Swiss-Prot record:
This is Bone morphogenetic protein 3. Residues 68-97, 261-300, 321-358 are annotated as: Disordered. The gene is BMP3. Belongs to the TGF-beta family. Homodimer; disulfide-linked. InterPro entries: BMP3/BMP3B, Cystine-knot_cytokine, TGF-b_C, TGF-b_propeptide, TGF-beta-rel, TGFb_CS.
Amino acid sequence: MAGARGLLHLWLSCLCVSLAQGQRLRQPFPELRVAVPADRAAGGGPESPLQPLDQVSEHMLRLYDRYSGGRTEEARTPGNSERGSPSLRPQPLREGNTVRSFRAGAAGMLENKELHIFNLTSLTKSENILSATLYFYIRELINISLSCPVSQECSHHAQRKHIQIDLSAWILKSSGNQSQLLGHLSVDGGKPHRDFVSWLSKDITQLLRKAKENEEFLIGFNITTKGHQLPKKMTPSPEPYILVYANDAAISEPESVVSSLQGHRNFPTGAVPKLDSQSRSAPSIERRRRKRSTGVLLPLQNNELPGAEYQYKEDEVWEERKPYKTLQTQPPDKSKNKKKQRKGPQQKSQTLQFDEQTLKKARRKQWIEPRNCARRYLKVDFADIGWSEWIISPKSFDAYYCSGACQFPMPKSLKPSNHATIQSIVRAVGVVPGIPEPCCVPEKMSSLSILFFDENKNVVLKVYPNMTVESCACR
């Protein structure tokens, strides 16, 4: 009986050790753990179309969550909610404003060498490469090294040597099946052991800069090992990938967000939602809507709220426009009263009658409503504009907008510029006819991180400036 208990304790201890080692295997590369976007973690949006076991997607989701101020790290740390820690603020991107990921395509052979081919045609001329890193998986090599018996030409000394990884980069030309050596690199993988890091990385910034300067965007990498008697060829699984940090000089140009997010010609048309399905089914209704809404939308062209023109009119205008008639006391007329008694209920006046006090309250309530320049709420849903098919996260964001009047005299809260102040005075004096009042425009704006697929189905993270209105002013 005692022997059985001893064997049971020994088995349980071995099981705990193996579980602890397996947990350590996932610790050295924290950026490659599964990352859940903030909108999915909160249940505010649909699940991401990314594959759950795809290391490239996990890495990009992690970066997005970090630079968009998500709460993934906070949610994983126990006790944060109890301590009442504030929500994470978006961090500035480490380098530039763009992170592009490139996954290896179908492997090819070049002079009996296996190449992992990358298509880098998504890089634009305006994107200046700041840094580039190649990530590759070597777990299979470690397993072979640790399981190699001494009898199969794997000496004890060879097993303890450092693993040396050789990387050779090739430029693949589409014409004539030509190839050109781009460069050689080596990586010291360290000594193989049970909790060895499964992923290694190597800086390839200079290689990609050289290829981009020569406008060569089809690159192949051959990954081999040396320094011991193990097989030279290594086939990493999962496939390697590249992360490129770049600074897009054209991201602040007009309509840059439209040109980069809407230019997805290769996406299947059936997957993109059709925005004009309702207008095709009911064209007459659409025409009636356009005619009816034309007058309503006109004030918005001048940064005015609908109905704002009533604020600055005199009381006579209200008297002309009001639909109600005030009650006026008149001397009693017996003949009229007799006639009114003869009328049936169908001949009663259809105009509602209110006293003067009720009308004054309604008039005062309308004047109290905020009509000055201010920030108004606006939520943009990418599904409404047909972009949800390739935008991974966020599915929607709070954009806000500025609207309202900048009439003289403007209070300090509207933060008018000197030019806006002078313009409002000139308009109020009326010396120069036709001078409009200053406009209500955004004063401060913040950026927005967007994670999306490019035309080659690679995951891209871009930080677009001036996407959310923080405050408004008169200019």
